[in-house]
UniProtKB/Swiss-Prot annotation:
This is 7-ethoxycoumarin O-deethylase. Its EC number is 1.14.-.-. It comes from the Eukaryota. Induction: By aminopyrine and other xenobiotics. GO terms for biological process: biosynthetic process. Capable of dealkylating a model xenobiotic compound, 7-ethoxycoumarin. Metabolizes with high efficiency a wide range of xenobiotics, including alkoxycoumarins, alkoxyresorufins, and several herbicides of the class of phenylureas. Catalyzes the double N-dealkylation (oxidative N-demethylation) of phenylureas such as chlortoluron and isoproturon with turnover rates comparable to those reported for physiological substrates and produces non-phytotoxic compounds. Could be used for control of herbicide tolerance and selectivity, as well as soil and groundwater bioremediation. Heme binds at C432. Belongs to the cytochrome P450 family. Its cofactor is heme. The keyword Metal-binding applies. Coiled coil: none annotated. Keywords: Heme, Iron, Metal-binding, Monooxygenase, Oxidoreductase. One of its GO terms (molecular function) is heme binding.
């Protein structure tokens, strides 16, 4: 049935494209030969960031493709990324909006997908000043420590019964509850039991459906049909999670007291002071963006880090030695400790270099024709920046495919968008606003897992847990989850 749907929709698209007489724009960057109807869709493969990196080695760091009806630009070098994300930032600042995101008109109020406008600037200001500012993060430091302690307690419980820990899932639940406490001052899910399972699952389902290849996105003529039902499915997920947010907002408003000091309080006060600029819809859209974008990044990075360290025991041993020397074996890593743990920080940077959570940064869309390095980029062009390829560029990185944290010991490179050789969170005005939280959470979670346990492979798991195969999605996780047994150090 799926095959028949795909074939029929492609044939319909071909007829419409032929009737409309869509031709190839002039003076595009080089790229592979296109096929009728599908263009270069067949070249994307199961892991597009890897396929695009291979194509860039043939056609160059500024490459054009035709994905169905959509002219596409792929950026695969630090120099080209700097041109797009910094020097011509405004020309490339508009987000491409996937059809599924248009469910409930989410793109009209989303900090991730709004074009640069007054509403977008207001949302960025709220996020930067009240969630991810240094003062806000310092005030919630005790909360992050508590959530890490809960993670370590869970691992200790697993150790008592010699059970394995699904590292990615445990880190995901920790991140989810941290965010819910930051926004609502309460857990929305029990981290390791079934209570609150619905909320956890609906957030996961949104991420899963966001990652599905949607024919509508490459053949917009099919928009009204939604042949795969992806937008309809997303609407169901949005309805559930927005309903939960409605209940929490109404519960707080009934009290008439905004004394928690959390993000919800800040938003409700803004709504009271500026009802024409900020309303219920804005609040719920902001919360949805925060949960979808803010839970996966940390957990995926932790899972890749633990996998790399288990594959390189000498690097894990060196990290453990540093932790024992600086804070003492068996201690929880605090945020203030991280500055005294340079090797741990190098490990985090190296993981983000090799395994950026979103290897293809959220795509941009060119609104008006622009010139780039002598090429003409027409209006409507989709723009991908391949952070995965940039982080593995052999002209920039020695032994570019090797996990070598020591490369950062004498380097001042950071991940905050200033150095275009390393942009796991993007750069420019569209840079991920959650960097300050991610760069605090990852080292304290990873360091605490290393400093409290040794880890062994669970022979009962029916696959190689150290397999490095990637699983495609909006973020890139391991295809085979890391499930390992903790052994307490004291």
């Amino acid at each position: 049935m799926d095959f028949l749907i795909i074939v029929s929709t492609l044939l319909l698209s071909y007829i419409l494209i032929w009737v409309l007489g869509v031709g190839k724009p002039k003076n595009l960057p080089p790229g592979p030969t296109r096929l009728p109807i599908i263009g270069n869709l067949h070249l994307l493969g199961a892991l597009p960031h890897q396929s695009l990196a291979k194509l860039a080695k043939i056609h160059g760091p500024i490459m054009s493709l035709q994905l169905g009806q959509i002219t596409t630009l792929v950026i695969s070098s630090a120099t080209a990324a700097e041109e797009v994300l910094k020097k011509q930032d405004l020309a490339f600042s508009t987000r491409n909006v996937p059809d599924a995101v248009r469910a409930y008109n989410h793109e009209r109020h989303s900090i991730s997908f709004l074009h640069v406008c007054t509403e977008w600037r207001t949302l960025r200001r709220i996020v930067s000043s009240n969630i991810f500012s240094n003062s806000s993060l310092e005030a919630k430091q005790h909360l992050r420590s508590k959530k890490v302690e809960e993670l370590i307690a869970y691992c200790r419980k697993a150790a008592l019964s010699n059970e394995n820990v699904h590292i990615g899932r445990a880190a995901f639940r920790t991140s989810l509850n941290l965010l819910s406490n930051t926004i609502f001052s309460k857990d929305l899910t029990d981290p390791y039991e079934d209570s609150g399972k619905e909320f956890r699952e609906v957030i996961t389902n949104i991420m899963v459906d966001s990652a599905k290849t949607n024919l509508v996105d490459v053949f917009p003529v099919l928009k009204k049909i939604d042949p795969q039902g992806i937008k309809r499915g997303m609407a169901r997920h949005f309805s559930k999670v927005l309903g939960i947010f409605d209940q929490l907002i109404e519960e707080r408003m009934r009290t008439g007291r905004f004394e928690q000091g959390d993000v919800l309080d800040v938003c409700l006060k803004m709504m009271q002071d500026n009802p024409n600029e900020f309303n219920h819809t804005n609040i719920k859209a902001l919360f949805l963006d925060l949960f979808v974008a803010g839970t996966d990044t940390t957990s995926i990075t932790i899972e890749w880090a633990m996998t790399e360290l288990l594959r390189k025991p000498h690097i894990m041993s060196k990290a453990k030695e540093e932790l024992e020397k600086v804070i003492g074996k068996g201690s929880i890593v605090k945020e203030d400790d991280v500055l005294r743990l340079p090797y741990l920080s190098c490990i985090v940077k190296e993981v983000l270099r090799l395994h950026p959570p979103s290897p293809l940064l959220l795509p941009r869309k060119v609104v008006t024709q622009v010139e780039l390095s002598g090429y003409t980029i027409p209006a409507g062009t989709l723009v991908f920046v391949n952070a995965w390829a940039i982080g593995r560029d052999p002209t920039v990185w020695d032994d570019s495919l090797e996990f070598k944290p020591q490369r950062f010991l004498e380097s001042r490179l950071d991940v905050r968008g200033h150095d275009f050789d390393l942009i796991p969170f993007g750069a420019g005005r569209r840079i991920c606003p959650g960097i300050p939280l991610a760069t605090r959470m990852v080292p304290i979670m990873l360091g605490s897992l290393l400093n409290n346990f040794d880890w062994k492979i669970d022979t009962k798991v029916p696959y190689d847990v150290l397999d490095m195969t990637e699983k495609n999605g909006t973020t890139i996780s391991k295809a085979k989850p890391l499930c390992v047994v903790p052994i307490p150090l004291n």
